[in-house]
Each structure stands twice: as C-alpha cells, then as structure tokens.
C-alpha cells in the first residue's frame, strides 16, 4: 500500500518517462508534489525503491526506472501519439452537486469544491463564470493548494480521455510545465488544452485531430490552473 504522495510521485515519474524518455529532475518532482525541499523527494524515492516500484540505474544521470505500478492506479485514456501526464479519474454515479455557500469536508473524506462554470474543450468560450454550486471530490484526488471544478463543454480533448460533460478538477496556479493540460485564458476566453512551450511561443494543443494547434506569444496566454483529476458521472 502506497501513501498518496508516494503514489503521486510514482505516477508522475511514470508519465514523464513515457513523455520524454527521461525521468524528471528532483526540482521538477518537488514542484509537482508541492514539497518544500528535495529531501522529501529523496525519502519518497527511497520508499518506492524499497517497495519494488522503482529502481535507480547506475552510472546515469536522472536515472530512475519504473518497475511496476500499483494495481489500483487509474488514469485517463492516453493521448494517441503523445505520451503525457494523465489525471486521476473517478467514474461512477458520484454525488450530486450541492449549493453550499461555504467550503466543507464531507463525511466520506471528500472536499466540496466550487464549480465555477463551463470550460471549452473545443473553440474557446467566455471566461470562467462565478461559482454556481459545489461538488464533493475525494481527498485522494487532491494535493496541497487551492482547487476548483469546471464542467467540460466540447470534444477537443477526447483523445486525452476528457469527454463532453465531464467535471475536471483544476489546481489553481499561474504556471505549468510543457505537456500539462491547463485552463488557459486567451483574451476574454477560457479553454482547456495541453500547453507546449516552443521557444518563445506558447502552443495550445487539442487532443482531437479535428482541432488545430493554436500558437500565441507568451504574454497572450494566462494560465489559470492545471488539470489534476476528472470526475465522470452517469445519470
């Protein structure tokens, strides 16, 4: 049994190796897990190594190899042709959104997050709205920091396993690594896309061949958070 942080680090290393062929640096791992120092990463890596999930490769820099993944690991469907970080997914009926005005912890170890409106997975729509209701989200899907929920509208991210009507869990922030799926504000419009840093430009990539990649200057794109999880509810 892995702790939440051990699981998060293992999946981050696994996805980064799939994306680039190289394990992430200690600085990247520290930032991804919101840890204050690299010593915490060293402890997590040692624990994963002792449990047989990863191993260090001798005589190579940044040399970590994922040996196995926990059986309960669940990720969204991979983007075809583009290995990348994929969020945790909770599928099922779920709990209905509530209209509670204040954040609170539910009895089943979940946190009620604000649903701030709809986000376009397609052509950008108007910028994020004000809170309309709240959705219980399991604590296991969340780390440190402030989070919010958006309802997906459109089909441009279907090859990343993100479907029309899904609820995406967003960690609030104004920075993201290349390859991460983000909420991007372009002018007065918000969209959910994979961010790529290409020299001095920012590319917003869809995960659907019907949609073109859009290129912007760095001052034209405002990151408002990055995707960390997804809830799919069946009615």
From Swiss-Prot:
Known catalytic reactions: Hydrolysis of Ala-|-Gly bond in repressor LexA
Active site: 156 (for autocatalytic cleavage activity), 193 (for autocatalytic cleavage activity)
This enzyme's EC code(s): 3.4.21.88
InterPro entries assigned: LexA, LexA-like, LexA/Signal_pep-like_sf, LexA_DNA-bd_dom, LexA_repressor, Peptidase_S24_LexA, Peptidase_S24_S26A/B/C, WH-like_DNA-bd_sf
GO biological process, alphabetically ordered: DNA repair; DNA replication; negative regulation of DNA-templated transcription; proteolysis; SOS response
DNA-binding region, residue range(s): 26-46
Entry annotated with the keyword Transcription: yes
Domain of life from the UniProt record: Bacteria
Site description Cleavage, residues in chain: 121-122
Region (Disordered), start-end ranges: 72-104
The entry's keywords: Autocatalytic cleavage, DNA damage, DNA repair, DNA replication, DNA-binding, Hydrolase, Repressor, SOS response, Transcription, Transcription regulation
Root EC class: hydrolase
Function: Represses a number of genes involved in the response to DNA damage (SOS response), including recA and lexA. In the presence of single-stranded DNA, RecA interacts with LexA causing an autocatalytic cleavage which disrupts the DNA-binding part of LexA, leading to derepression of the SOS regulon and eventually DNA repair.
Assembly: Homodimer.
Family: Belongs to the peptidase S24 family.
Protein name per Swiss-Prot or TrEMBL: LexA repressor
Organism of derivation: Caulobacter sp. (strain K31)
């Amino acid at each position: 049994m892995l702790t939440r942080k051990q699981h998060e680090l293992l999946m981050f290393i696994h996805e980064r190796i799939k994306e680039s062929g190289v394990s992430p640096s200690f600085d990247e791992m520290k930032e991804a897990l919101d840890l204050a120092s690299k010593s915490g990463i060293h402890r997590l890596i040692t624990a994963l190594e002792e449990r047989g999930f990863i191993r260090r490769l001798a005589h190579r820099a940044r040399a970590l190899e994922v040996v196995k993944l926990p059986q309960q690991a669940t990720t969204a469907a991979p983007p075809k042709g583009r290995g990348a970080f994929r969020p945790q997914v909770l599928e099922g009926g779920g709990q209905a959104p509530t209209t509670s005005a204040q954040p609170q912890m539910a009895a089943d170890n979940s946190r009620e997050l604000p649903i701030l409106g709809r986000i376009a997975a397609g052509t950008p729509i108007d910028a994020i709205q004000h809170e309309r209701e709240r959705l219980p989200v399991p604590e296991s899907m969340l780390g440190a920091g402030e989070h919010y929920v958006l309802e997906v509208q459109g089909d441009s991210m279907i090859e990343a396993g993100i479907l029309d009507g899904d609820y995406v869990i967003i960690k609030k922030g104004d920075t993201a690594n290349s390859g991460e799926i983000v909420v991007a504000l372009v002018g007065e419009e918000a969209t959910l896309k994979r961010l790529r840093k290409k020299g001095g430009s920012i590319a917003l990539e869809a995960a659907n061949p019907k949609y073109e990649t859009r290129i912007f200057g760095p001052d034209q794109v405002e990151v408002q958070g990055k995707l960390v999880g997804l809830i799919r509810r069946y009615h």
